[in-house]
Design a protein with these regions (language model features):
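Short, solvent-exposed mixed-charge patches
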Residues: 174-175
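A short, flexible N-terminal coil/short beta segment enriched in small residues
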Residues: 68
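Active-site beta-strand/loop architecture of penicillin-binding DD-peptidases
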Residues: 1-56, 71-171
């Protein structure tokens, strides 16, 4: 089959669980700065309406206990599940979900990879941190990557780690 969801769509599907039921518009940059290091365009969290027919911004109708169960499950993935072998981030707990998706698209067919019982696999990992109060969420997708936790997991972990390392640099420089 074909991958019908983009990484941004996969990320978007989990945001209500990380933001107490609210949809948050994904953002790819923190801020825009000029040559002198001054912030020209700051980052602003933008909420999206789960029910656009009403005048206010609505939450996705998910019970709080469901949000808690999903988040605890994603924490357990990294603590003692498929993501337990990922490197830790010093001083930060993170959570996530790995995914491995068999596929047989036109590229795999041309390479004769679509063998019944041994189809090629895409690697996925969605991670966020800190686990208790998320600031950042990341999706890693590796085409024909194999096992999600082994291939895409380390990619997501490295992005999360880089975020927190850069955050420490900002703090050290008073930003």
């Amino acid at each position: 089959g074909y991958v019908l969801a983009t990484p941004i769509q996969v990320l978007d599907s989990v945001t209500p669980f990380l933001n107490n039921g609210f949809l948050v518009k994904p953002t790819l940059i923190k801020e825009v700065v000029d040559g002198e290091g001054r912030v020209v365009t700051p980052f602003q969290v933008t909420y999206r309406d789960a029910l656009p027919d009403t005048p206010e911004i609505d939450r996705v109708p998910i019970d709080g206990w469901v949000i808690d169960v999903v988040r605890r499950g994603m924490e357990k993935v990294v603590q003692d599940g498929t993501g337990k072998d990922l490197d830790r981030i010093e001083g930060v707990t993170f959570a996530g979900k790995s995914g491995t998706a068999e596929y047989c698209d036109n590229v795999a067919q041309k390479k004769n990879l679509c063998q019944f019982g041994a189809w090629p696999e895409h690697a996925w990992f969605l991670g966020y941190a800190p686990a208790d109060k998320p600031e950042i969420a990341v999706v890693a997708f590796v085409y024909n990557g194999g096992e999600g936790s082994l291939v895409a997991g380390p990619v997501a972990q490295q992005v999360l780690q880089a975020y927190f390392e850069l955050k420490q640099v900002d703090v050290a420089h008073g930003q």
